Each structure stands twice: as C-alpha cells, then as structure tokens.
Amino acid sequence: VSFNLNLPEGNTVSNVLASLKLKSGTLIKSEDFSAKYYGSPINDWKGSLIDITPQKRYMINVAEKDTICMKGSPYLTEEFPITISPGWNWVGYVPSTGMTVTQAFRGLTPLNGDIIKSQTLFAQYVAGIGWIGNLNFLEPLKGYLLKISNAGTLVYPTSTGNRPIEAISPEALAAQAIQEAPMTFDF
C-alpha cells in the first residue's frame, strides 16, 4: 500500500491508521522501518517508523479485514522525488491518478531484466520492446517493488510533453474527482 494524501493533522503512523480497529500486534513496515501497535494499557504505536511518506511502499498486517479512511490534500508529485538504487526498491505511488508503467518510469533508464511488481502483478523490462507482463498500469494507493539495474531519481510525470497525462481507467478519473473524499483501503 502507499499513501498519497497529506493529512491536516500530519502523516504520523497513528494519524494515517487512526480509522483502523486496532488490536495489539497490528504491524506496519516500510523497507527500513516498522511500528507495532500495543493495546491497553499503552494504546500506542511503538517502533522506528514514525511518519508515513508518499514515496514509500508499506506493508500492513492486521488481525482481520479492516478499512483505512483518510481525508487530506493530494501531494504534488514533483515535490516528492524517489531515490532509486540498484537492486530492490520499495516504491510508493505519489500521483492521484493512474498511469502506465512506461509513463511512470520515463525518467529512469531500465535495462533488460528489470522488474516492477505489485502484490499480485508484475512487468519485466525487455530491451527494444519495453515493459511486458500483466502489470501495465500503476494506481494510487498501491505500493510497488522495483528491481532495477541503474540508479536514478523517480519523479512521477504530471504531463507528457505539453499536455497532461490522460487517465486510462475510469477508476483513475474518479480518484482525481474525489480527492477531498475519504480514501478507503480494504485489507
């Protein structure tokens, strides 16, 4: 999962996950940090993960299906570049509309065999052809694993040439139209 809204009260773990029915042992982790929820008498998150950033992918482990609801302002993608290192990178999706893998990674230099994957889909870069696989479209609120050969900086584009990126899916168009509505994640 990734989070692409700036909450008025701040993007701490406890603010972002406030709508969850929290139980002891609920866990959120990024590539480098994690936080675990401790119930009564503590009733708080403890760990090295303090703030949620839009550049990162997160994994959340809950005891039962739950929904995260958020209300905030969308981030400007150009204000949140993502440093990409050779090897595996946990990448958040900053834009509030979806785009193709090719559009999203146009600022990177992929090599043959580089991989992008979501929880259930993937694409591999094939020189001379481009990204192939069943992951064709990156979406808001999803997190991705990117294995890449060349270091770079990922800045999701807001336009292609002189025109805005066209949303491909109806869901992406709907997401843009309701940016101020609560965002819901089902686990």
What residues fall within each predicted segment?
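N-terminal exported-region signature
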Residues: 1-187
